[in-house]
Amino acid sequence: MTERTLVLIKPDAVERQLIGEIISRIERKGLTIAALELRQVGEELASQHYAEHESKPFFGSLLEFITSGPVMAAIVEGPRAVAAVRQLTGGTDPVEKAAPGTIRGDLALETQFNLVHGSDSTASAQREIALWFPGI
């Protein structure tokens, strides 16, 4: 069964010119990029995207980071796309939880600057795709 998921290549990855590397890893896994858009994220979209973290102490710095520079947003499709992207990205903490061979394990050092976001469930993917790509 084909699934869709949202991938965000965050400002730290864009600044470090890692877009091609990350997209390449997704495509080499056998997934398809169905939509791709480089955009500057406003506070409203960022707040909606990270609404589940609103009561957490890091919410303000999370919004500040995701709005600090351009983000490459992508709809990724393929069999088990949500789980496949989560496997590719690795754990949220790039040093302690992300395995070598994952995007974060290979390319990131800090939890806040962990390069990439992937939806954590099919329900989250549907909600996030509707936010980031409302016309699709």
From Swiss-Prot:
Keywords on record: ATP-binding, Cytoplasm, Kinase, Magnesium, Metal-binding, Nucleotide metabolism, Nucleotide-binding, Phosphoprotein, Transferase
Gene from which this protein is expressed: ndk
InterPro entries referenced in this protein's UniProt entry, alphabetically: NDK-like_dom, NDK-like_dom_sf, Nucleoside_diP_kinase
Family: Belongs to the NDK family.
Source organism (scientific name): Mycobacterium leprae (strain TN)
Active site: residue positions: 117 (pros-phosphohistidine intermediate)
GO biological process, one term: GTP biosynthetic process
Main location per the UniProt record: cytoplasm
GO CC term, one of those recorded: cytoplasm
SMART domains: NDK (SM00562)
Name recorded for this polypeptide: Nucleoside diphosphate kinase
